[in-house]
Amino acid sequence: MQQRHLSQSAHSHGHGTRRAHRRNTIAIAVATLAVAACGGFGTNGSGGNTGPNVKPAFISGPVGVKSYDGNTDDLLTAGLGKDGLAAAAPAFANPNAPTAVELRRNAIWANYRAIVDVQAAGGYGSLYGPNVDAKGNVTTGQGKVPGTEYIAFTDDGSGRQNVTVMAQVPDGFDVKHPCIISATSSGSRGVYGGIAVGEWGLKHNCAVAYTDKGTGAAPHDLGSDTVPLIDGTRQTRAGAGTQAQFAAQPGASETLAGFNSSTPHRLAFKHAHSQQNPEANWGANTLQAIQFTLWAVNDKFGRTNTDGMRQATFTPANVLVIASAISNGGGAAIAAAEQDTGGLIDGVAVGEPNVNLPPTAGVVVKRGGVPVAASGKHLYDYTTIANLYQLCASQDASLGNAPFAKTAGQAALNRCASLAAKKMIAGGSTSAQATSALDALHRAGWEPESDDLFASLSALEVGSSISVTYANAYARASVTDRLCHYSFSSPGSPPQANPVTAPAAALAGLFSTGNGIPPTTAVTLMNDANPSGAMRDFTSISPSTKLADGNVDGALCLRGLLDTRNPALMTGIGQTYRTGNLGGRPSVIVQGRSDGLLPVNHTSRPYLGLNKHVEGASSRLSYIEVTNGQHFDGFIDVIPGYAKRYIPMHVYVNRALDAVYANLRDGTPLPPSQVVRTTPRGGADTDTVGPRIQPSNVPPIAATPAAGDAITVTGSTVDVPN
């Protein structure tokens, strides 16, 4: 998909020169003094003759604008405050037809909690949270932020893209030191998926640029033919027209009506079924969100001309912009910085980013001076490996006390037997087979620190959910194609768990509660190849093995698309490679060493090497690897055993933002690449909520790391200490 109307960005590979306004410390100081001297950029200030504030041409349809008083409702907590975010979910007055206000409130509640641990014992309210101010001080307030929210679609006029962009402009926006933080949604979430990262910006009186990057939580229900609108409310497909946030299109061989008749009760999700390969455009979407936010800032705070028109007072030349977010959003921020040819972005601060290196990157990753078994694989490559082996590997004797180790039950034992029968692992017993599967994962690049996560990731169907959604996305498949015999539906009662009509209340609330990548609220993966008819994937039977083995046939089919170089899939994958060129911008990446979803050997470690190789001496990227950190802070103090093992990575995402901001504002040097050695809180494997965390559990990033903690790069070889 070609991006249109991108006046300040293009699909650059970043090898050219950047706009001369890119900040160094002196330029920042001069700009700050100049702004202060003219009294800021308020309605009576002088921002220069920059012309009228013109809405970006890529905005399609109306712009929704709402102001929040910071009491009954607000930008950060939707009026819930710090305590409300940690409490039970707010109720809908009519669960079958929640209002837009209710959906927004619950989306903020659910998405905030999905990203951070909201238990006080885990650090909420003391190390982070709405009541912890920009300087880290714990206040007695609720952390509500008054301001104005702007929301709109970007599209080419067809209504097929309809990427949501949103700007939150706090009333306290610092017009003398203007700043914007991007917070692109993580995972496949909707536009509020980056709210926990956006919190940092709001606390620093920055505007925040959000986008759902062409994904989203609410589906097209094919049975009722209803679709989500931008505010999460639902409408018939015909009634929504081009204002549908997502409406599925049929494939080449079947109409939607025909598909719905032969395959009833199915749901289409935007990331999987938009046929747009959204990931190819995540960088461009993030740049659009920043441009939209610049327009919104000017709409609220730009100088007013004599004719009453707002002026484009705030521009890339005088607004500090940091691209931030985590996971897929972090990858989008990096892509945006690589593709930014218009000088929008000044720095990057991301956590656990999904970054894919081209096959020709030539980067070598070492740990403790020894080359790792594998590095630099693409997300689809390593995830389809995980989808095959993690379920069996979770039964290794060394992992008997891992979180959810006993949850998978017979499916895990059968997966081991099926893999052994297909000569994919060795061993004549489940124990030996599990050890062989675990070895296969280590050979594929997982660090041993990730081992304890395999059982819970398998039980939660993480590998299968990502493999299915991304296979469809990369191949630009339609919902009617049922790639590898998978579909999405609400499950009936077990043990059959056949497709049924989605419960009305669950469907109505999915904009708020869903994650956009089934299994999610009341929706699961269906194995349409199950011998007795479509059935929940995890409990289904594989035709080739006649075992309930978590659908090994489906996992092999998804892997086979890569192994056979399926043309559509390979084209889509080829559109997601990063260049490594951040244009010399000050940048910090943080990631947990234990990350079992996006392994460090395939993401941040090799990206550091690629960046240093491409940029050479101009590189200003620091990589911070955190021991005892993993991908899902939201699981800590929720899944028994996580609190014992893992620290909150959100603390280090905030510290990365602090470091980049201090560098851009004050010239404070970035911390060098290093390993930060944390201390888990401890407790028992059966503890859901662990002992209270202390600051000593999460030490700061060192300005000068010890020699044994320094990460080094020589040429394109990265060496991470043990």
Curated annotation (Swiss-Prot):
GO molecular function ontology, one term from the record: hydroxybutyrate-dimer hydrolase activity
Residues spanning the membrane: none
Keyword Hydrolase on entry: yes
Reactions this protein catalyses: (3R)-hydroxybutanoate dimer + H2O = 2 (R)-3-hydroxybutanoate + H(+)
Location within or outside the cell: Secreted
One cellular component term from this protein's GO annotations in UniProt: extracellular space
Region Disordered, residue ranges: 1-20, 671-697
Coarse class of the protein's main subcellular location: secreted
A single BP term in Gene Ontology: butyrate metabolic process
HAMAP family (alphabetical): 3HBOH
Protein name, entry field: D-(-)-3-hydroxybutyrate oligomer hydrolase
Provenance organism: Cupriavidus metallidurans (strain ATCC 43123 / DSM 2839 / NBRC 102507 / CH34) (Ralstonia metallidurans)
